Amino acid sequence: MVSPSLEQFTQLATQGNFIPVYQELAADLDTPVSAWHKVCQGEAYSFLLESVEGGETLGRYSLLGCNPLWVLETRGEVTTQTFRDGTVKTYSGDPFGVLPQCLAPYQPVTLPQLPPGIGGLFGFWGYELIRWIEPTVTTYDRTPQDLPDGLWMQVDSLLIFDQVKRKIWVVAYGDLMTPGQTAAAAYQAACDRIQALVQKLTQPLQGLAPLVGWQPPQGSADPALTYTSNRTEAEFCQAVEQAKDLIRAGDIFQVVISQRLTTPYQGNPFDLYRSLRLVNPSPYMAYFHFKDWQMIGSSPEVMVKAEHQDDPGSPMVATVRPIAGTRPRGQTPAADEALAQDLLQDPKEIAEHVMLVDLGRNDLGRVCTSGTVRVDELMVIERYSHVMHIVSNVVGHLAPDKTAWDLLKACFPAGTVSGAPKIRAMQIIHDLEPDRRGPYSGVYGYYDFEGQLNTAITIRTMLVQPTGPDHWEISVQAGAGLVADSVPASEFQETLNKARGMLEAIRCLQTVADES
C-alpha cells in the first residue's frame, strides 16, 4: 500500500514542492546487495551505502538508488548539471557555491513515518577542490584522462533497508517544481516509479552467483597480488626525510604523504564491492557507479557530520572524528591487545593524534557557536579487519547562520589526510607527491532533505577505471602521517598496511577466478 494518499499528498503540497511517497516491503529474502543487482545493474549512475559501525556492528540503515534526477559534475573551472531528460546547465566558479545553488529551488517535505536522513544528494568531492577554499595551495593541472573533481547525484527515488526491522522502504518523490504540474500528476508519477521499483525487487535474482572459492585473509601476510606504485620505496623514503627537515625547521608539525598502488582486474566491478564488504567492513561502505567508472569505499573515518537533535528547536550537532595512529591486527586476542597497548603508549602516535584532535577543534570552532566545541571521546582504540586505530570524537553546535555545507568547507580536507598546520601541510604535499590525488583524501557521502550531512574521508577506497571490455585498472591510495621522529621505512610500511584490506579484497576475487 502506497502512503500518503492522494488527498494527504495534496495537503502536503501546500508545505513544499518535493514530497515523498513510499511503500513498505518485508526484507525477507532480499539484501542490499541483491536489491542493487535487481534494481541498479545496468544503470548509468547508481549508489549503495552500507555501514558497519566500529568495524564490528552492522549499521541500521542501508541506502541504494539509481537513475538520478540530475548529475552535477565538476571538472576544473566548469560544473555541469545534466538532467535525466538530457537538459544541461553549465556553471563556472566555486563548486562549493554551485551545489547549494542547484538545491535552492527544492522545498522538500519530510514525513515522520520515514527513517531520518533520507533522500537528497549522493556523491563525492576530490582533494584538488581545496584550491577553491585556499588559493595559496597549488594543485596539479588537470588532464583529459583525470577523473572528475567532484560528482553528485540528486535522486528522486531510492530504497532504504532497515536491518533491525527487516523491511524496505521504497521511496519516490512527487515533483511539483515543473510549471503547471498538478498534485495529482506528481503523485501518480511517484506511484509509477514505486511500482516499477517494486516490480524489479520482486523478480527472481538472476546473474548473481555466490562468491564460491572466496578465501578470507590469512593473518597479516602480504597479499599475493601484483601491483605498481606511483613512486618507488626509495622515493617515498626520500620524501619522508624532506618532510622531517621541514618539521625540524618549524614549517609544520605533521604532514601526510601518500602513495598510489595500481593493479589490473578482469571481471565485474560490483564483485569488488562484495569482496571488500567481507574483507574490510567499515562504517562507510560505499559503491558508486559513475557511468564508466566506479568508486568503491570502505572508509573508517567520518569527514564531517551535521545532524539534528531530537528537539527541533535545538542547533544542529557538528561532528568530526579524527583517526590517527595505526597498528596491524594481532593474530591472537593476546597479541591484538598487546599491539593496542603499544599503540596507546607510542609517543610519536600520541603526539600526532593530539595535534589532529586540536586541528579538528579549531576547524569546528570556525562554524560552531563559541563555547560549544568539546572532545567527548578521547583516544580510544577502534579495530578493523587489518588494522587498529586511535580515535577521538569532537562535537559542537553549528552556529545558526551556518549550514552543513559551511561545516564541510571549514573542515575540508581533513587534517588526518593533510597535516598541521593544514594550509602549509597541503603546500608541502604538492611539493612532495608526484601527481594529483583525485578523489583520494576528499570526501564522499550524502546530504539529506532535512539539511543533514553525513560524509566520510575518501580513504580505504578503490577507484576502478576501464581499460577494455571487462578489463579494469584499480587504484588504491594510502598515506602516512609524518612527524619529527618518523622512521621512513616504517612510514612506507604503514601505507601498505592501510592498503592491505583493499588488496586482499582483490586477491580474494582472483582466487575465485582461478578456481572457476
Where are these regions (language model features)?
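Extended alpha-helical targeting/anchoring segments
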Residues: 1-516
